[in-house]
Amino acid sequence: MSLVRRSNVFDPFADFWDPFDGVFRSLVPATSDRDTAAFANARVDWKETPESHVFKADLPGVKKEEVKVEVEEGNVLVISGQRSKEKEDKNDKWHRVERSSGQFMRRFRLPENAKVDQVKASMENGVLTVTVPKAEVKKPEVKAIEISG
């Protein structure tokens, strides 16, 4: 898959057809560029501590009622929601529109040690924090075997 669009006249591969070009665009419903940007714009950090997996998503301007946190297929954490569009007045004259609106969704496959039945989520100052506790790692039990003979 080509990540950078080639435009060099001297590049012998510039005009090759890329069969994967546009594959991911077909997975997202046809929307405006602004809505597509919102879909991909939910930035999420994932860190692992000794006790849990912690996800932090920047969702400025999104109310907690507009966000869903779910675990599906047993171990896939799904963070999704909707950024509401600002109401427009007929008399308004926009000079610049940079804030995106529309749907967003992020999915994360959780490791086997995740306690998916104890997931907690909170939202403060536009930052969603999802905490997934980890199961304690059982240390292998060593059993001494007596040697006969």
Swiss-Prot record:
SUPFAM superfamilies: HSP20-like chaperones. The keyword Lipoprotein does not apply. Induction: By heat shock. One of its GO terms (cellular component) is cytoplasm. Residues 35-149 form the sHSP domain. GO terms for molecular function: unfolded protein binding. It is found in: Cytoplasm. The keyword Protease does not apply. Belongs to the small heat shock protein (HSP20) family. May form oligomeric structures. This is 16.9 kDa class I heat shock protein 3. It comes from Oryza sativa subsp. japonica (Rice). The lineage of its organism: Eukaryota, Viridiplantae, Streptophyta, Embryophyta, Tracheophyta.
